[in-house]
C-alpha cells in the first residue's frame, strides 16, 4: 500500500533500511507507548524480508542517522566527527577518517547510558536528563502535555520557558561528556541533532 501511495513500483524496491533505538525497551523511559515491550520479541528484519522479498538492513538509530549525515549532510565536510542524536532517548555515533566506527560490540557512542548529575545533584543516566522523554516529563510536571516533537513549537510562553530551562540543563549535563569525547577522539566537529 505504501509503495502505491507514493507512486513507486515494487520492481524499483531494492531493499529496506530500518533504524531502531538500541535496547528497546529495556531502557525504560517515561512516555513510552503501552505496547513498547513488543520490540523485545519482534525481529523486524525477517518479518519485512518475508513480506516484501527484498534485503532488509536494521541499524541502531544513531548509527543510521550518522550514515545519512555522512552521505548527505555535514559528514561530507567533516571526516572525523561525533554525532549526538536526541530522540525519546539519547544516542551517539562516531565517524573516524570517513568511516563509521562501530566498536568491538557495535555499541560505540552509547551516550545515554553514561552517568551524570541532575539539577539536584543525584547521579542518573544522562538520557534521563537529556532526551525528548525527559523534556516531555518536565513539561508534564507543569501540566503541559506533549507527545511529539512538532507539538513543541506551538507552545505558549510558559512552555517555551520550560524548554529553554531544559536546554540549559541539557547543555550542563552534556558538557563533561563532550569534553571527554573531544580529548579522547579529537573530532573536527560534534553534531547535535534531534
What are these regions (language model features)?
Residues 23-24, 89-90, 135:
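Conserved sequence/active-site signature of Rossmann-fold short-chain dehydrogenase/reductase
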Residues 1-14, 27, 50-54, 72, ...:
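ATP-binding/phosphotransfer module of carbohydrate and carboxylate kinases, centering on a glycine-rich
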Residues 20, 86-88, 194:
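Short secondary-structure boundary segments
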Residues 2-15, 19-80:
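Glycine-rich phosphate-binding loop and adjoining helix at the ATP-binding site
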Residues 74-130:
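Glycine-rich phosphate-binding loop of actin/hexokinase-like ATP-binding domains
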